[in-house]
Amino acid sequence: MAKAIMVQGTASHVGKSILVTALCRIFRQDGYRVVPFKAQNMALNSFVTADGGEMGRAQVLQAQAAGLEPAVEMNPVLLKPTGNAASQVIVLGKPVGNMSARDYHLGKNQDLLGIIEETLRRLHREYEIIVIEGAGSPAEVNLKERDLANMRVSRLAGAPVLLVADIDRGGALAAVVGTLALLEPEEAEQVRGIVINKFRGDRSLLDPALEFLEARTGKPVLGVLPYLQGLRLPAEDSVCLEEADTAAEGELEIAVLYLPRISNFTDFDSLALEPGVRLRYVKDGEPLGSPDLVIIPGTKNTTEDLLYLYETGYAAAVRRAAAQGIPVCGICGGYQMLGRELRDVEHSESFRDELPGLGLLDVVTTFVGEKILARARGEVCGGGPLFQEIAGLPVAGYEIHMGRTVLGEGTRPLLRVVEREGGGGGDFDGAVAPSGLVWGTYFHGIFDNDLLRAHLLGWLRRRRGLSQGTLEEKAGGGRGSTCLERELDRLAGAYRAHLNLEKIYALLGLPGPRLPRPGAGGGPK
């Protein structure tokens, strides 16, 4: 049976996900079979597993840190907001319907508790350590009775809790003391250690505050984690994009429209990691400018976000950019927006039966009730100056969409779908305008294909008169995955040096590392 430990926070965005990621990598480095788990996650940024299930991206990164293939059991309940007060409910990877926040929190979520409990039992049998992530704060008194993500899960898993606070925003001590004060005595007893996150400066100046915190709460401080500059790991929450701007300068500028319901923005991480590329999220009120490439990303509600483009003037700005010869591409919902029309007679996304698109691609999208969830492989069909040189190039991605898109006569598809996991293939995906400068696809992760990404960036550089290497040199031999592994190791190394791992292993009831690690044993005692 596995041992378990849980990471909870004094608030959202204090660093729970990143600490779970680091612990998964540390325990893996130390020789343990470790698995991440989050009972209930709310996120727009999702991932499709090998068997066609949908799960949160944070647990995907944590699975990679643990050396595992992502599986829906790591995130049995996923809530994908469809509006300000409603979400699509996904259970063990499959959508079961939409639910208002009121209905969900007033008891209709309790049927999910048995699924969470059974999933935990399965993980206990298959792994040696389970690292569990909580959600938000465990001290939300109005939600606590029906909370499926925090203390109830800790009890089910028999997991001691590490409570994380973000000192960079100020008020960390008050947040810790206040959180513990709002917990029931038996819940506070489950908290076995405190972790201070995002610390900058002289640690000795913080020591008196830590001594006060331990004396006031009776809980040991098991780590003071540094503020890590320039850590290149995928973000799950669009809140993390508020200040995103990958470089002040770059040979190439790629502008991504920051939609109100943006989803799967990890599609652009590989572009952001490329040297000489500035990836800029264009937020409400900011000019689109004259970038080298405009991207309309995926969205949880295509209709509402298309209306946003019309209302803010970005629809006209994208059309002007295309008319000026600036390449424009759309991913999933962004692809649908580029077409002539969106039809929604079943009112899957809004109460509008139809809405005109941007008219940059001769395609029409109809929304249906059944969602396509699949990993897929395809080949570039060619078309226009960008794709004609790489016709036949293999690519891989994944699909998450409820729209069905039909191409107009004379419009070329972007990809031929060779295979969809779970069955299917032999059809086509995406579309390319006759100019070859406007294109769209349902393939999330298309920019993670090294050769396609290298060709795209090389072609953009050539348009600017910039130097470029061979396709293989530009591809960098899979730079994206190599960089991710390097960054996960960097994260683990930094946290290993600032966590009291001896006491954390003691909380788990384990003797400590099985394998020697460089620098092991250098953490605080």
Swiss-Prot record:
- Where does the source fall among the domains of life? Bacteria
The record's annotation in CDD domains points to: CobQ_N (cd05389), GATase1_CobQ (cd01750)
Q: Pathway, per Swiss-Prot/TrEMBL? A: Cofactor biosynthesis; adenosylcobalamin biosynthesis
Keywords of the record: Cobalamin biosynthesis, Glutamine amidotransferase
Establish whether keyword ATP-binding is in the entry.
Answer: no
GO molecular function annotation: ABC-type vitamin B12 transporter activity; catalytic activity
Q: Which InterPro entries match?
A: Class_I_gatase-like (IPR029062), CobQ/CobB/MinD/ParA_Nub-bd_dom (IPR002586), CobQ_GATase1 (IPR033949), CobQ_N (IPR047045), CobQ_synth (IPR004459), GATase_3 (IPR011698), P-loop_NTPase (IPR027417)
Domain (GATase cobBQ-type): residue spans on this chain: 251-452
Heme as a keyword of this entry, yes or no, is no
> Where is the catalytic site?
332 (nucleophile), 444
**Gene Ontology annotations of biological process type:** cobalamin biosynthetic process
**Which NCBIfam families does the entry link to?**
cobQ, PRK00784.1
Identify its protein family. Answer: Belongs to the CobB/CobQ family. CobQ subfamily.
Question: What job does the chain carry out?
Answer: Catalyzes amidations at positions B, D, E, and G on adenosylcobyrinic A,C-diamide. NH(2) groups are provided by glutamine, and one molecule of ATP is hydrogenolyzed for each amidation.
* Protein name (Swiss-Prot/TrEMBL): Cobyric acid synthase
Lineage, top ranks = Bacteria, Bacillati, Bacillota, Clostridia, Eubacteriales
